């Protein structure tokens, strides 16, 4: 039996039962699938989290993102979804993503 948790207010999904092989980041005009094998580290706090992979950096801004940081550290996150324009300005939820950006890292 698989346990998949999805909360529309959080804009991210986790899977606690299976080994996750990749993180899917869905933006308004593009989708990235980043393999967990290339995950280096995550850093941040309640209002911003950065997840760094070998060639990309995922920057998430919002509220209550400490829970996302913990989920990333455990590599349980299957999906991070950029909110729609209308959802970006909600203020009643205690956890939500306001903005997601994916940047390609410079090579030396």
Language model feature labels by segment:
Residues 13-16, 41-42, 51:
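Short, exposed beta-strand/loop patches in secreted or surface proteins that constitute
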Residues 19-33:
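Short aromatic-glycine motifs in intrinsically disordered, low-complexity regions
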Residues 60-108:
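Helix-rich interaction surfaces within compact, conserved domain-sized segments
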Residues 1-17:
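Anionic N-terminal interaction surfaces
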Residues 45-56:
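Short acidic, Gly/Pro-enriched loop/turn segments at secondary-structure junctions
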Residues 40-42, 56-59, 66-67:
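Short, surface-exposed beta-strand-loop junctions and turns on beta-sheet-rich folds
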